[in-house]
From Swiss-Prot:
GO terms for molecular function: DNA-binding transcription factor activity, RNA polymerase II-specific; RNA polymerase II transcription regulatory region sequence-specific DNA binding; zinc ion binding. Residues 20-48 bind DNA. This is Glucose starvation modulator protein 1. InterPro entries: ERT1_acuK_gluconeogen_tf, PAS_13, Zn2-C6_fun-type_DNA-bd_sf, Zn2Cys6_DnaBD. The lineage of its organism: Eukaryota, Fungi, Dikarya, Ascomycota, Saccharomycotina. Residues 65-93 are annotated as: Disordered.
Amino acid sequence: MTKKLSPLEKKNRKPASKACVFCHSKHLQCSNERPCKNCMKRNLGDQCHDAIRKRAKYLNTSGVKKMKSRTNSISSSYRSPSVSESPQNPYTHSIIKQEPDLNMRGELQSIQQENTSHNQPGPSNVSHYVDQRPTIPTNTMLDTTNDVLNKLLYSEPIHSDSISLRDSISEQPEMDSNRRSIDTMFNSNYLNQEYLMLGDIILHSKPSSPSPSNTSASEYNGDATISPANTLLNNTRLDFDNSNDHMSNSKRKLNKLKDSRPFIALGVSNDVPISLQPEGTLSLDNLSTKNEIMNKDNISSNSLKTDYVSPLISHHIYQSVQDIYMHSIPNFDYPQSYHSLTNFLKRRFSGNSLAHDQRQAKRNNLLIILKLIASYRPTFISAHKNLLKPYDLLFLEMSFQRSLIDYEKLLLFNSSPSIIWRRTGEIVSISNDLLSILGFNLSEILSKRTFIMELMYDDESIINYFKLFKSVAVGNLHSSIITKCKLMKNSSAAFHNEASDVADREYIEFCSAWTVKRDPFDIPMLIIGQFLPILPGGEGVRKY
């Protein structure tokens, strides 16, 4: 244990200008003489010498700049064919120009190897040096941020189909100077991410209709995309059938990819057909192999049936678990289902025949519902953006049909009236008890696209439905909900056995309990609702 010093000793002692190795490692107060007192006490006098300090970074800038200029002169005088094409390839150029700090260690090691070698560096040696540089993955987020900034601040997007090779080479230095001035604008990845989203909205996003559901029409379609920029990515499939057009096609497609960027997704999307290597060098063998794989996926996705199949037909096809694996499962088009839901809500809340105040109240209710849908739909889209299409989509639909068969068997042993619907609200199963209570038959509900909201009588029940579904759609894993709602009766059906006041009304009030079944991605797949009617009190009538 270190001896406790008196106040006089503390006052008289002077700190050493440099500590020895032992005192520096043990964080002890060292003295100026060598060997110091601490080393003498521990019989380490022969090992006592000054600790070597690291040189400050600001003192190394001049030496690093000289080494950088030397390496740049060597690489410019002797350049391999893959690097000489960098003005045409934006990804190679971004590595050489934008990331000197990341590649500095590799440059210093290369300079040391060059100084120790006896041979004079020739063109073959330097090309080997350039090719053997350590590959460090580039920050593609920063690269695309610079592209967005260049578009917003300096010039319009450059389309490679409308310019020649000479024009693209002449315009590259100007783009590089603009890019260098913007490199250090944002040091935060989150800030760059925000700016990328804003840039995509400004440059690319043009919704086809004011409906919020149209902004995300690609939840499950392999060919649909979230933004028009993804359409450009899907259109840039490389064709390697003719060997003479390999390099020209790759250059043209890469230039087209430079001015495009999809919205942010969870992981790397499998829709992108080519691999952009950090050095910008394209391996034709790898690209042709990947192109064949993607062509097979495109064929399978195009052959995937997306036509609407009513739940009534599905019940006749998939009557057992064996039928699910024996028959081909058509892909359920969730975006189209959301569009149909939006059209129904617009018709339901139009209020054309009502007074101005009532029509305005209807529109306000519609706005509330659309905001609730827009709050959870982007999460569904982003969670399914990285699915392997069409195989994951088939797996999810098979899981849905498999769960539906199990729950329908369970409802046969349950005496309460029940409805099963998808997360879009589309009804896929309804019990005979509830059909008899409401006065509908099975074909009226399941032979077409019918939403659970269509059976609700008042606007308050519909708004309450979307509020409750929003509470369990994202984040909250509580899988049961208890609420009240009013379901309308069939106006053409006759009710003779009910109480007089119930028969006169156009609706029946129910106490409802929901059970939410989630898919493997923790997104609601189907909802099982049990509805118990609330009947008026009286003799011989049970009230729930």
